[in-house]
């Protein structure tokens, strides 16, 4: 059975400012760096063999801190990037016009093929994060990878593994530097394929980030 750990990046400046990040970027806060160090301490006891990270700056930095703790190399995979939020990226939630808020709600509330202008749909996000996950099956036997990604991307992945629509990620609370675990199993008696073992564990953190943006 392959165990794969999923980690959301540490708190960023834009998380704290309630600003939409998407595939744009802002640096980790001091709290975000501390959260990543606490993930590293936990990861050291989990037997992690590979770290695979989104290539955006906030995930890169989170992965670097974790890698220092557990002594693993990092592979960067663009398929683990956050949802492309198009023309709304870098905007503060409270500054959106009624029309812009409508675009955002269409996307996150499950409108079929909904997307923000210039961005991508939840189905497109789901397709690429599942492709990244499938690559873990090609790792050597006995591997235990840790994937560093983003709130919407990881929520979409966990939701769809559970058989829910991609936009059901809104119902998952994956806080900054939370740890989830999914397993790949082959069994005649249990569900074969990917199963969710845990989601959104923050027991390793002193104080979880207070942001609710999930991105």
UniProtKB/Swiss-Prot annotation:
Keywords: Glycolysis, Isomerase. Pathway: Carbohydrate degradation; glycolysis; pyruvate from D-glyceraldehyde 3-phosphate: step 3/5. InterPro entries: His_Pase_superF_clade-1 (IPR013078), His_PPase_superfam (IPR029033), PG/BPGM_mutase_AS (IPR001345), PGM_Phosphatase (IPR050275), Phosphoglycerate_mutase_GpmB (IPR023086). Substrate binds at residues 8-15, 21-22, 58, 60, 82-85, 104-105, 151-152. GO terms for cellular component: cytoplasm. NCBIfam families: PRK03482.1. This is Probable phosphoglycerate mutase GpmB. It comes from Salmonella typhi. The gene is gpmB.
